[in-house]
Amino acid sequence: MADTVIYEQQDAVAIISMNRPDALNGFTSELCEDLLLAFEKAQRDNTVRAIVLTGEGRAFSAGADLKQGFVGDRTTQDKLLFEYAPVLIAIAEIPKPVIAAVPGFAAGIGLSFALHSDLLVMANDSFLLSPFTTISLVPDGGANWLLVKQLGYHRAYQLSIESERIDAARCLDLGIANKVVPADTLRDASVAWAKELTKRAPLSLAATKKIMRHAMDNDWYSCFKMEAKEQQKLQESDDAKEGVDAFFEKREPKFKGR
């Protein structure tokens, strides 16, 4: 990883920070590559059980760096398919909860990265923005799918075409954000929440994420069957036995992920 991403670890929490503050963490090919490497590192590391994704400086991300967005050999379509998509797929498929912590604002494809995370914490003075109709482009990074899934067609379309700021309080009301915290506590609050999640059974966290991601695209019965399959696997795990033993012994369980 280069300087575009800072990778840290606190206890069982990996903190992945986009580090282009002078460019408001605008996305470049290099940033996409470094983010993918960071998520791959977090996935391989068995000591990591939860991840916080955030941005250094005044913003989570202003979206694609337009100064660099039209340079290079790749078309815009290829950049989306072969640079951005692998990172977003990694976020969806990594068997660990990913919390997006949003300082300042998340705009453009930065909005997509925030929404695509498993959980979203926003600073109280932050906002989300889909600015595409002001620059004759279309929401990308899967934003159309995410917004329609979360808000329904009419509200999603309105928010996208009006290109208005959606402040943190409204995001909470809409169910987009999970938590809104004071701006000066955003990082600490997000890491603290992640640390709480690391106390949960990692196999259960992974299976629940897998099933719920599946549920967004599939029917009730296919989800039911997946639940049954995962339940059988988990019931046979050492962690399930530990959880039951800890319950009856009135102590905190010590999960090992197996």
Regions found by a protein language model. Give the residues of each.
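Glycine- (often His-adjacent) and acidic-residue-rich active-site loop
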Residues: E33, G55-A90, A106, T134-S136, ...
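Crotonase-fold acyl-CoA enzyme core
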Residues: I89-L205, A228-K229, K233-S237, K241-D245, ...
